[in-house]
UniProtKB/Swiss-Prot annotation:
One of its GO terms (cellular component) is cytosol. This is tRNA uridine 5-carboxymethylaminomethyl modification enzyme MnmG. NAD(+) binds at residues 273-287. It comes from Enterobacter sp. (strain 638). PANTHER family: GLUCOSE INHIBITED DIVISION PROTEIN A, PROTEIN MTO1 HOMOLOG, MITOCHONDRIAL.
Amino acid sequence: MFYQDPFDVIIIGGGHAGTEAAMAAARMGQQTLLLTHNIDTLGQMSCNPAIGGIGKGHLVKEVDALGGLMAKAIDHAGIQFRILNASKGPAVRATRAQADRVLYRQAVRTALENQPNLMIFQQAVEDLIVENDRVVGAVTQMGLKFRAKAVVLTVGTFLDGKIHIGLDNYSGGRAGDPPSISLSRRLRELPLRVNRLKTGTPPRIDARTIDFSVLAQQHGDTPIPVFSFMGNAAQHPQQVPCYITHTNEKTHDVIRNNLDRSPMYAGVIEGIGPRYCPSIEDKVMRFADRNQHQIFLEPEGLTSNEIYPNGISTSLPFDVQIQIVRSMQGMENAKIVRPGYAIEYDFFDPRDLKPTLESKFIQGLFFAGQINGTTGYEEAAAQGLLAGLNAARFSAEKEGWAPRRDQAYLGVLVDDLSTMGTKEPYRMFTSRAEYRLMLREDNADLRLTEMGRELGLVDDERWARFNEKLERIETERQRLKSTWVNPLADSVAEVNAHLAAPLSREASGEDLLRRPGMTYEQLVQMTPFAPGLDDAEAAEQVEIQIKYEGYIARQQDEIEKQQRNENTLLPEMLDYRQVTGLSNEVIAKLNDHKPVSIGQASRISGVTPAAISILLVWLKKQGMLRRSA
């Protein structure tokens, strides 16, 4: 039986990728259907109760700049906000927020249910309708068929999902949810390369059984950061601290003594896990020289007693999990309310996708999220938005769009995936972007909102606020450029008080702001340059644009040079362990692949453009640079 109305776009799955995809397609005016096995779990945080972090926060800001949902949702659900790397340069500063799971899910569902052009329907999907290598619809569990011009698959870990706790395992999409077996089998019949990955989650602890009095507190920042360019701190709920404990030798002994009961070490799990979010058993074995690991005790919400112990993801048996938890300070009497587990699932080789996230083999079929081999809510949301907007464009018979590497971390993400693929869960870091000085959190709107408007993703309210901000930035830059202070003027003493050496010649506000140690806030408190902007975002942008102008110009030159090095040959017998500055991951992959050129090296999954830059500098210093004819 066919549903009475056809749709332009169908989204299968209501996680972080699916919800962004559905919102994007609907915002662009296309009739959109979101199919989910359970409406109550739309936007659910399956693992850690947090949004953002290094590289990840950048993606959230970019999703927001394109009119997406995630930043708005976390502003209404975040119970602790921090700026990571606050003491470092603006390129690597990143926002992170602890979330109240219930508030986050509510914010997502409210947005979905109030989005025009979007219908939500609760039914698991078991099949796709494919005609002449083109997807034209989907079939649900009860045999109901929906027709559409484009379909987006955002099924997370549900495809043939298998949950492991110790040596026991069972089918599941995540704890408490069934897997998607029939759809997995159907997709395996299509001309797509499929493999298995694994991820895990820690046990959840009853907060009433933890002695917080002996633990260090970690508070959020003041003033409280805001994620969305449309948000404000007044939207945040009550703010609460996290707590810190540590594993110890007793913890590590428990783990080492029970490795034979670990599904990973017993060879039961075939899928490869995330390198940068390893299980506690992996950490203990890989970093045997460390006698402790830091564990963050993160509240799951304002109305919940559950605590997420960030850092002890595990698939060891439940009795071992209890021993691990109770071996740590403050946790001696702790009770587990949900066991930790590992989950294996199908993912599809993203090299089979176009940069728009459309399949190269099935027209109109788009993939986003963990099905593409990524890990993390933020990576999923970014892909979901891109897949949703391109599914909408496909259904309207328009060309697809994907950002370049120099435009967005989203561009880095999809280029890495579609060009190099991945053999392990892919996570975003600032180090993956060679243009990171230009791809900052603070300028995500300046980079992407205009394009979002052209694509139909950005509404009138956001567009108006964006243009007001642009005008304030430009007006203030011109004011500082044209406001001068003379070394003989009466007001110069006020200026000299903030300088390492007194002014010897006339200087503009821009000249002074470029000086080391001078901030915009200091500058506009001086009589010649007062008053300053009362818009903190615009003020930050003025300072960064002026201070980093020269660095950005130099980075552009470096980019051009790097492109000329495409055919630079690499020594055949080079041991990459000699190259200082490369990560262990990159060293292992270069030594394994032994690429013949820089160009070939740059296409190896996991070898970042930043690593290529390090390698080029090292080769030049060693006098080993050779170019092919």
